[in-house]
Swiss-Prot record:
This is Recombination-associated protein RdgC. Belongs to the RdgC family. The lineage of its organism: Bacteria, Pseudomonadati, Pseudomonadota, Betaproteobacteria, Neisseriales. It comes from Neisseria gonorrhoeae (strain ATCC 700825 / FA 1090). Its main location: cytoplasm. GO terms for biological process: DNA recombination. Transmembrane segments: none annotated. InterPro entries: RdgC (IPR007476).
Length: 299
């Protein structure tokens, strides 16, 4: 239930859907399995295992999930069958098979195999935080995050969401914090970072499980490298990697949050309810503090 990586989008809090409206709209775009000659199928599915509902509400949060099912048809399988058919035609009819005919044969083979192909599925989850006005997506890959945002917009007929563009870049802030040897506010340096230089061949330095205030680490910044990833700890509650794209990776929710969730959840539903609220509130509060050190949002 706890997101391990996050992309997020600021939302217009005045135009967020109610839980029942969101559920009705998502029902019109519900997931169905791949049929016949379809290569993939995509739609909304239940975000929790103990309920068939398409929206899991918890106080000021709404959880949704997008499922994608894809046919798995290895190119090598198609190629082998095609070669067999081409050889059969050449032997039986004593003629060559041209490029156009090979393409037609390939399409016929694909159409024949698709209905019987294996499938693989994946899902992307997101939580609406209606109190803070954020959409938190459980994926740091921009393509995956933007895809669920697009599907939500299509289902709702629009959703006012923007990219998290701040006045100062995350890379600039991270570089400054590493250079000065400490962070601001509730943030502390952890033990991992990545730095990049400039030039035709960009040098990359990865630091893992080391003291980030050590001279040999700081010297990379003094030599002109910028920080692209930085391990941080926020108020002894969350440890994470901040990236230059303003995504969060390798998120760890420390004991204080885990214990609070467990104390408020007597069963699977109760634990999911408490965990969702605590995750959304702590992450959103942390993001707001981080945004303040980044100079606020761009106009």
């Amino acid at each position: 239930m706890w997101f391990k990586q996050i992309s997020f989008y600021p939302l217009n809090k005045e135009k967020l859907p109610e839980a029942d409206v969101l559920a009705d709209k998502l029902a019109e775009a519900e997931f169905t399995h791949c049929q016949g000659l379809d290569w993939f199928s995509e739609g909304f599915t239940a975000p929790v295992s103990f309920s068939p509902e398409l929206v899991f509400p918890a106080d000021f949060t709404l959880r949704v999930a997008l499922k994608k099912e894809e046919k798995v048809l290895p190119a090598g399988v198609i190629r082998d069958i095609l070669e067999e058919k081409v050889a059969e035609i050449q032997n039986n009819e004593a003629r060559n098979v041209g490029r156009k005919e090979k393409q037609e044969l390939k399409e016929q083979i694909t159409d024949d195999l698709l209905p019987r192909a294996f499938t693989r599925s994946s899902r992307t989850e997101a939580v609406f935080n209606t109190r803070h006005g954020y959409l938190l997506v459980n994926n740091a890959a921009s393509a995956k995050a933007e895809n669920i945002l697009t599907k939500l917009r299509e289902a709702l007929g629009g959703l006012e969401a923007s990219l998290p563009n701040t006045k100062q870049s995350p890379s600039s802030l991270m570089t400054g914090w590493l250079l000065q040897g400490h962070c601001e506010g509730g943030f502390e340096l952890d033990s991992d970072c990545e730095l990049k230089g400039t030039g035709d061949i960009v040098p990359v330095v990865k630091v893992s499980k080391q003291d980030l205030t050590a001279d040999e680490v700081v010297q990379h910044v003094k030599n002109g490298k910028t920080v692209t990833r930085l391990g941080l700890v926020w108020r002894e509650q969350i440890a994470f990697i901040l990236t230059q794209d303003f995504t969060l990776k390798r998120i760890q929710y420390l004991d204080v949050l885990q214990e609070e969730a467990e104390s408020n959840g007597d069963d699977a539903a109760g634990l999911a309810f408490a965990s969702q609220i605590l995750m959304a509130e702590s992450v959103s509060t942390m993001l707001e503090e981080l945004v303040s050190y980044l100079g606020g949002w761009q106009d």
